[in-house]
Amino acid sequence: MASDEVMPRIIAIDYGKKRTGLAVTDELQIVPGALDTVETHRLFEYLEKYIQSESVERIIIGEPRQSNGMPSENMARVREFENRWRKAHPEIPIEGYDERFTSVLAHRTMIDAGLHKKARQDKALVDKVSATIILQDYLSHR
């Protein structure tokens, strides 16, 4: 493959009860970046619009787990979303990825970036950064 060949993107989801953070790779699937934060009840529609304009290879969705590895209370909602996506879009696989500690890492990243306390309290920003961390971790382990 030529180094300048455009590849389909990979999307990462930090699925929340109210809000969901999204991140996406660049066209070469090398660099992840924050995409958006959407209200969770609008996520499916948002992704359907996105795939109409961008080629997407797969979706990585954070699996909410407790520190001991057991599923958290949000896992059922994540599984429900995964199943709905698979039925509607079998051509774009969705796979779970351990998201333990991504919120902590997101806050640490924001501190290291020099963001002020007010910016770090922006939950939508934390969600996008968390999704970016999920995607970066996925890319580094594939």
Positions of predicted regions on the chain:
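Phosphate- and other anionic-substrate recognition elements at nucleic-acid/protein interfaces
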Residues: 2-13, 17-142
